């Protein structure tokens, strides 16, 4: 966090502390009442409830210098805000509702809705396929940011939302990974995990695949 940055109402402000190495806040950033800044999301719980997969999420949040963030704004992961920016205030079954959405009518099942006013932006199946397609890249981003911050490799805990990349039903799961598989739904996940074909032999194989210094 750069100099001259102020959080005016810390009690109402939520800044994601789970992965601090994914967040950079510049100088003279003014963070007002009710602001939320996230470096991960738990919307994958809906996908897990329907499909069974653990498809974690992670992404950088970079806020430049001389930025004003208005009341009630929500900044999601994988977001970069440049310098000299003003962020305006206030920025169903198996439904994912995007941050800061205004829902003022009924919506069908199995959709993702967002906006003010809210509208359907895609089906749950489309969102599921999208998450699968970028899941590994988000894990790689996490590794690179962790290395940059701490100059060492992330471990089992840091990669707990991405362990399906390097773990399958033939491996003995650590308690944290067992817990992840038991969230939301167990039976669907157990069946899906039996079918999971890990891309990497183990966590070290995955980490070796990510070049240092990029």
Range-by-range predicted roles:
Residues 3-81, 89-94, 117, 123-125:
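Flexible, glycine/small-residue-enriched loop-and-beta-strand segment within the central core
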Residues 72, 90, 98-100, 106-107:
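Conserved metal-binding segment of the jelly-roll/cupin
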Residues 79, 100-101, 107, 116:
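Short beta-to-alpha loop/turn elements within the nucleotide-binding domains of ABC transporters
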Residues 104-105, 123:
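Conserved acidic donor-binding loop of glycosyltransferase catalytic domains
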Residues 109-114, 125-126:
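Catalytic binding pocket for nucleotide-activated donors in carbohydrate/polymer assembly enzymes
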Residues 118-214:
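Terminal amphipathic alpha-helical/low-complexity segments used for targeting or macromolecular assembly
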């Amino acid at each position: 966090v750069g100099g001259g940055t102020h959080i005016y109402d810390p009690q109402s402000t939520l800044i994601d502390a789970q992965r601090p190495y994914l967040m950079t806040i510049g100088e003279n950033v003014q963070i007002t009442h009710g602001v939320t800044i996230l470096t991960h999301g738990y919307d994958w719980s809906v996908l897990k409830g329907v499909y069974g997969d653990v498809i974690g999420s992670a992404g950088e949040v970079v806020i430049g210098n001389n930025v004003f963030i208005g009341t009630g704004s929500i900044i999601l992961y994988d977001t970069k805000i440049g310098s000299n920016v003003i962020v305006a205030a206030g920025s169903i079954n198996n439904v994912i509702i995007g941050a800061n959405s205004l829902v003022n009518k009924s919506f069908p099942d199995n959709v993702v809705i967002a906006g003010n006013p809210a509208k359907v932006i895609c089906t749950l199946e489309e969102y599921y396929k999208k998450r699968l397609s970028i899941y590994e890249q988000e894990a790689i981003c996490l590794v690179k940011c962790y290395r940059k911050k701490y100059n060492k490799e992330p471990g089992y805990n840091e990669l707990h939302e991405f362990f399906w990349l390097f773990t399958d039903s033939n491996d003995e799961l650590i308690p944290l990974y067992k817990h992840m598989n038991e969230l939301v739904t167990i039976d669907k996940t157990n069946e899906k995990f039996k079918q999971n074909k890990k891309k990497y032999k183990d966590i070290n194989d995955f980490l070796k695949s990510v070049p240092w210094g990029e």
